């Protein structure tokens, strides 16, 4: 399963269109392909900053559903911009640190002389 952080941005000119489009997903009136796609997404949290015209969503998608889950992005692409970043949980990051402690990582040579 992959975990992602998605940042969605809009402008004052596209705010209403995005809200109307997103409402069709929430209310279940979007095209079936979009609703099926969104059903593949396990939303962990979604936070919205109205002052900055952006929202941040943390979600997970099963590896086998990655392609289909992108249908939602295509549905929204003309009313907002989206950035998606693959991430790991803090708990998984701690496992990485246990596997390779900082003292085992060589110090870089000075970049300036």
Annotate each language-model stretch with its function:
Residues 72-77:
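Short, surface-exposed basic-aromatic patches at helix termini and helix-loop junctions that form
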């Amino acid at each position: 399963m992959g975990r992602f952080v998605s940042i969605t941005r809009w402008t004052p000119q596209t705010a209403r269109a995005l809200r109307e489009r997103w409402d069709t997903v929430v209310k279940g009136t979007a095209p079936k392909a979009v609703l099926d796609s969104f059903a593949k997404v396990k939303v962990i949290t979604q936070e919205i900053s109205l002052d900055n015209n952006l929202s941040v969503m943390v979600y997970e998608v099963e590896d086998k559903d990655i392609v289909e889950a992108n249908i939602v992005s295509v549905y929204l692409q003309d009313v907002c911009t989206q950035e998606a970043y693959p991430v790991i949980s803090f708990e998984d990051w701690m496992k990485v640190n246990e596997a390779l402690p900082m003292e085992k990582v060589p110090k870089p040579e000075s970049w300036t002389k």
